[in-house]
Amino acid sequence: MNKISITLIITLVMLMTACGTAKKATVTNPTGNTTQQTTVQTQTTAHYDEIIATLGTWQTMQTGGSLTIDVGSSFSSGVQVRMVRDEAIFISLRPMLGIEVGRLLITADSIYVIDKVHKRYAAEKVSLLTAGLPITVSTVQDMFLGRPFIIGQGTLNQANKEKATLTNDGAVSVLTPNDKYKGYSYVFTFNKSHNITSLNITPASASTSAYQVRYSNVKKTTAGNIAHTFRANGTVGKKRLTLELNYNNIEWNGSVKIDHSLPSSYSRVNANQLLNLFSN
């Protein structure tokens, strides 16, 4: 149980910094037959609109669920998840009888991990994870809920859709943001019902994704279509990591309590030291 909180940090590092450095390169799409382009553009606009129509607005969410982590050995825990849009993500680990053994809190500028088993905590600037990228709490919230986003632009919407390219073969739609961060690209895929199915992060030198999030159990809610199963895969150092987060029914826009307090009697640990436990 002592590794669960650490692994949560690592998973966030894997997902938030895999796009590489803050330097970006803009990809220009090739030109072609004007008539063909017009037809494709009309189809693409329709698919864009249908995908965007599935994305609602929300202010708060809270739910219970389960978390399974495999990083050489596997462990599972019940969880409580709470979010305030643009402000905070709170995950409480409760493996037995609803007793909290650890928690993770991400705010606009900081990340906190509390390990109640060993009475220690880590408190770091969120820049530890973002490495200079314009990634916000909202970006991570979108990632956890299965909502497509464009780094630096927010959730996909009518105003920013031109900053990505959408292709469709009738069964699968692929959304590729135009701005690529040096060394990596990231793409979203959707099924024919316009539900998100994956987020793939791929190094420029590779033909397959190095980091992948699979989304399933997508449900229509008051906040739009939300994936209730989130499964992330990737490699951290020499270790293969898999994390699966399953949500129960989500309560939206209610009163949510986010505990920002840090236990004064706990010892503070450098988060980089925790990360190094899994880097070899």
What are these regions (language model features)?
Residues 20-76, 271-280:
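N-terminal leader/targeting segments and the immediate start of mature chains
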Residues 20-21, 156-268:
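Gly/Pro-enriched, hydrophobic low-complexity segments
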Residues 1-8:
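Bacterial N-terminal signal peptides that target proteins for export
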Residues 75, 105-106, 207-212:
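Amphipathic hydrophobic-ligand
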Residues 72-85, 89-98:
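Structural recognition of beta-strand segments within beta-rich domains
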